[in-house]
Amino acid sequence: MNHLIDFYLVRESKQKDSTGQTTTQKTFVLRMGRQKSIYQDEFYKAEQAGLRPQGVIVMSSFDYSNERFIKIGVQEYSIYRVYYDGTDKVELYYGERVGN
């Protein structure tokens, strides 16, 4: 798996409503990147940390603003690791939390 895809970075902002309750507002920002498979070593390390890794997205570092979630299709995932490769690219490792 190494192909271009469209995906959304999920930006969250917290606001208080009229009753004083804090609510989270999500904004979905469309981006394009290259989807890659996870190496076996990365898969096992993530599993040991309680994560179910799903893949890696390589995208422009200029378009990434420390978002914690990514949406691919209808599924939202946590970004559990970010790697800047020293150029203008960033690798976003994403997956699901296992258990509680």
Regions found by a protein language model. Name each.
Residues 21-100:
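Short, conserved turn/kink motifs that form compact alpha/beta structural patches or helix kinks used as
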Residues 1-34:
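Extended boundary segments
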